[in-house]
């Protein structure tokens, strides 16, 4: 019996890392543990999450795919096929970009580029996440980017972040955003993590 109690306590503590609650009431360790356990974000070779570093379009595309039901559809290794002139064959994110574009979560630019190394702003991330949740521009009130940012916050996706329109996202911001995504409401009314 004495061995059973510590085991049960350890099990309960481990499972709480996997239960997503809005980031507003969650501590950093729970948020980080959840996004890492789900494979949405990983640290560098030393395990450092580099939470103050900015995020680029390629990294964000990977996070979108890893947070989606399509995460297993990404071929292992880099692809020899690229949709964009500036995403070279063999680029580490080629497959993630392909899936994110095919699903309509992100788009390229009219000049045929994706700009994978370009940092991403809040409004760009908000638009992509809303599309991931099934929302279309016609479901929103107002115009870009205010409509997207308003819906993003109304769904609780921005809990735990301080950036505003026009500002670049950090890895720390993305960690909270993707944590919040798990409990966000989809267009169909279900909780995202259950879809």
Residue ranges and their predicted role:
Residues 2-31, 36-61, 65-94, 102-168, ...:
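Feature responds to low-complexity, polar/acidic, surface-exposed segments characteristic
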Residues 178-180:
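Extracellular, beta-strand-rich glycan-interacting domains
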């Amino acid at each position: 019996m004495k061995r059973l109690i510590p085991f049960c306590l350890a099990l309960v503590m481990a499972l709480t890392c996997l239960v997503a609650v809005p980031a507003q009431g969650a501590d950093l360790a729970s948020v980080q543990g959840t996004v890492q356990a789900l494979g949405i974000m990983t640290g560098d070779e030393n395990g450092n999450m580099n939470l103050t570093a900015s995020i680029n379009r390629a990294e964000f595309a990977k996070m979108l795919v890893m947070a989606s039901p399509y995460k297993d559809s990404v071929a292992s290794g880099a692809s020899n096929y690229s949709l964009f002139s500036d995403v070279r064959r063999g680029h580490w994110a080629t497959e993630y970009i392909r899936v994110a574009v095919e699903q309509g979560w992100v788009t390229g630019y009219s000049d045929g580029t994706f700009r994978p190394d370009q940092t991403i702003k809040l409004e760009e991330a908000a638009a992509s996440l809303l599309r991931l949740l099934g929302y279309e521009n016609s479901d929103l009130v107002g115009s870009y980017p205010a409509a997207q940012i308003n819906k993003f916050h109304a769904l609780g996706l921005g809990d735990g972040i301080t950036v505003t329109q026009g500002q670049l996202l950090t890895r720390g911001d993305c960690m909270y955003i993707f944590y919040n995504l798990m409990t966000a409401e989809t267009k169909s009314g279900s909780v995202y993590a259950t879809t």
